[in-house]
């Protein structure tokens, strides 16, 4: 950070991989959202504090709707979207069912509370996959898909309420 101090960056974003366990790649580790103590031995809050001390806004990457194959969340079938009773899987990812109260509590803790408690003022939210033609849990697959899209938008509102003033990039 010292080396870029005089460059007029407004925001410094810690990108994908901040949660990286030592045994897998960043893409397959999404979903558990536990900060890496290897990458951030003093904790990610210390990194955010250092960013702000250099006069920049601290930002963090999230893809809050998915669980990668190597995460514990990938196997938490009661929290995941399904189609025809089978967890909806796209390559190495599954999707959280954002309609469920347990998932809402999980995302609140892992994303919203985490961002607020660690002093992040900016979040970069990727949506690198999609659920296709829909999911179970409604009168049709399409209606299930519509409900999930609507719930994703509600999460942006929840995020703004949980972290006042946060800038959201998508």
Map each language-model feature to its residues.
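Short, solvent-exposed loop/turn and secondary-structure capping segments
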Residues: 24-25, 63, 69-73
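Extracytoplasmic/secreted cell-surface and envelope-processing proteins
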Residues: 22, 70, 132-134
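Hydrophobic faces of well-ordered beta-strands that scaffold small-molecule active sites
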Residues: 10-14, 58-62, 123-125, 169-170
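N-terminal substrate-binding region of glycoside hydrolase catalytic domains
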Residues: 13, 18-39
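Active-site neighborhood of glycoside hydrolase catalytic domains
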Residues: 36-54, 74-170
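Non-catalytic terminal segments and appended small domains
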Residues: 20-21, 67-68, 80-85
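Catalytic domains of carbohydrate-active enzymes, especially glycoside hydrolases
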Residues: 2-21, 117-119
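Active-site beta-loop-alpha junctions enriched in small/polar residues
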Residues: 12, 16-19, 63-67, 128-130
């Amino acid at each position: 950070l010292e080396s870029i101090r005089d460059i007029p960056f407004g925001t410094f974003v810690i990108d994908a991989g901040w949660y990286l366990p030592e045994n897998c790649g960043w893409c397959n580790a999404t979903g558990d959202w536990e900060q890496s103590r290897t990458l951030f031995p003093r904790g990610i809050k210390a990194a955010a504090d250092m960013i702000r001390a250099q006069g920049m806004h601290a930002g963090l990457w999230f893809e809050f709707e998915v669980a990668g194959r190597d995460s514990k969340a990938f196997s938490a079938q009661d929290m995941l979207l399904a189609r025809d009773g089978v967890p909806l899987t796209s390559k190495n990812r599954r999707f959280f069912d954002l309609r469920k109260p347990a998932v809402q509590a999980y995302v609140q803790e892992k994303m919203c509370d985490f961002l607020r408690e660690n002093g992040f003022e900016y979040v970069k939210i990727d949506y690198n996959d999609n659920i296709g033609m829909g999911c179970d849990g409604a009168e049709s697959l399409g209606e299930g898909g519509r409900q999930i899209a609507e719930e994703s938008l509600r999460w942006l509102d929840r995020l703004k309420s949980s972290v006042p003033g946060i800038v959201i990039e998508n």
